[in-house]
Amino acid sequence: MPYAEAARALLRESVLDALGDLLRQRDWSAVTMSDVSRRAGVSRQTLYNEFGSRQGLAQGYALRLAHRLVDAVGDAIYAHVGDIHGALHSGFADFFAESAADPMVISLLTGEAKPELMRIVTVDSALIVVPASARLTESFMNSWVAASREDASILARSIVRLAISYVSMPPESDHDVALDMARLLSPFVETNALADKA
């Protein structure tokens, strides 16, 4: 990775970490760009240059959460070689546990309504779904699953869209939604991707 790209990625991570820290202390409605720039140790101008606006900052944070879903499912694929049901169950369970504890998600679900945050996971969700799905597609193509691009893309988009929908409406506490999702999606992989190798 070129130096400039690595420096930019580090800057974004530092800013998003700072936002997460602030959200552990107060609601999203009380967090300003000045607060974030101070906590991250960067100028407000740098913050605006990188994210464009407060909404852009929230989108960047949501995209990082979606990439954590991709990481959770990707890690689970490699931890459960030959067991797509186990991989999906583990990946969803890890993501749901992480998102339930995430300060931005907690802020979205508590206190006053936050339409600007809700837009990110509903109307404007393509900003999250498209890049996260692209990464997850590669995971399904380049792992033991070895799905075709078409099958991997269908599966990845479905996983990301379903998981993101649970951010705004968390899974029921008396139900193993991760298990349900694995049961729902595993047959697609077994019938399409894995059947081609049998």
Task: Describe the predicted segments one by one.
Residues 40-51:
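Short hydrophobic/aromatic patch on the recognition helix
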Residues 70, 103-107, 116-146, 150-157:
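Amphipathic alpha-helical packing segments from all-alpha helical-bundle domains
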Residues 1-39, 56-59:
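Basic, helix-initiating cap at the start of DNA-binding domains
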